[in-house]
Structure formats: structure tokens, C-alpha cells
């Protein structure tokens, strides 16, 4: 397997009697305090910071970096070449494409009416080559289109079209400036 786990990690936390296996690809690095539940699969090159939680039924592609104190709360699909910075929260039923950057303390949500109604939980969909700035919030069910850029502190309440800049609270859409146009360079 050619992987490295620090002391104080839990790989294969059994959340119930039906819990399956964990599958980590080559060259995984799981740092101390991190918990990876059963029924998680990751491609090659997964690297975590300290105190990361990756819950059950999560699938991660190749070369995913998960920053310290990040929670991936289960039933999440993450593509390849993704950089998730410190303190990010990713709720169940979220889909993240390839070559995506999530800035520090970004928060994704999946419940449009917390404890008020019993609506189905719908996490955001983040398409390929998207960058999400620090402290941005994405509300339940929104889609951020490919090659878009969400500014720091933005609150995204509605879908962001491809190649669009979303800034402010609530986020307004602007044409993507030329210097932000193109693919993310995450390898």
C-alpha cells in the first residue's frame, strides 16, 4: 500500500454492524487525530492534515489534499486533484468535481430549512476547475458551474453559471475577469 499513518489515527471506524472496508490508494498520508470511517474509498495520493474526519460512503479521487480540522460528513463524492484547505465543512450529498480548490473555512450546507421542515438533504454540486474562497458559504442544492470563482466570504444562495465570478452576501454574479479565466493548476 506504501502509505503512512501517524499515531493517533483511526482508519476504518466502524459506525455500525453493516460497516464495510476502507480502501486507500498508494501513497496516502493520514496525520494524527484523523478518523477515516469504514466504507470510504480514496484513490492514490490522499493527504490529510491533523484532526480530519472522513465519514462513511465517501469516495475521493486521486491526489486529494484535505486540510487540518476539515469534516467530510459522509455520502460525499470528490474528484481528483482537489485541494481542501483548513477547517472546511462538507455535508452529506455533496458532489465535488476535478481540479477544485476550497479555501480555508469554506462551509457547504445541505439543509434548506434546518429543523423546521423535513425536506431532503441536498448538498452543493461543485463542477470541475472551480475555486471557492476563504470563509465562503454555499447553501443547500446550489451548483457552481465549471471554471467559476467564488470570492472570499461570499454567500452563494443560487446557482453560479460556468465561468462566472460570485462575490458578496448574497453573492452577485459578474463576468469572470480575464486574470481568473482558465483551469485550476492543481496537480
Language-model segments: which ranges?
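Haloarchaeal acidic low-complexity proteome signature biased toward cell-envelope/secretome components but also
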Residues: 1-2, 185-187
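Flexible, glycine/small-residue-enriched loop-and-beta-strand segment within the central core
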Residues: 2-143, 169-170, 177-178
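Leucine-rich solenoid repeat scaffolds
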Residues: 155-157, 164
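Conserved beta-strand-loop-alpha-helix hinge in the C-terminal portion
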Residues: 162-185
Amino acid at each position: 500500500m506504501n502509505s503512512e499513518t501517524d499515531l493517533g489515527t483511526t482508519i476504518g471506524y466502524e459506525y455500525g454492524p453493516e460497516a464495510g472496508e476502507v480502501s486507500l490508494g498508494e501513497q496516502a498520508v493520514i496525520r494524527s487525530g484523523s478518523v477515516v470511517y469504514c466504507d470510504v474509498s480514496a484513490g492514490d495520493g490522499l493527504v490529510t492534515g491533523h484532526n480530519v474526519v472522513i465519514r462513511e460512503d465517501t469516495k475521493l479521487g486521486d491526489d486529494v489534499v484535505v486540510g487540518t480540522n476539515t469534516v467530510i460528513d459522509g455520502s460525499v463524492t470528490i474528484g481528483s486533484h482537489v485541494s481542501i484547505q483548513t477547517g472546511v465543512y462538507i455535508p452529506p450529498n455533496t458532489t465535488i468535481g476535478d481540479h477544485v480548490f476550497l479555501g480555508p473555512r469554506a462551509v457547504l450546507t445541505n439543509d434548506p430549512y434546518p429543523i423546521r421542515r423535513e425536506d431532503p438533504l441536498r448538498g452543493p454540486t461543485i463542477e470541475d476547475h472551480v475555486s471557492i474562497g476563504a470563509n465562503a458559504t454555499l447553501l443547500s442544492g446550489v451548483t457552481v458551474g465549471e471554471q467559476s470563482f467564488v470570492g472570499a466570504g461570499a454567500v452563494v444562495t443560487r446557482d453560479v453559471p460556468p465561468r462566472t465570478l460570485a462575490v458578496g452576501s448574497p453573492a452577485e454574479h459578474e463576468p469572470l475577469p480575464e486574470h481568473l479565466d482558465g483551469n485550476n493548476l492543481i496537480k
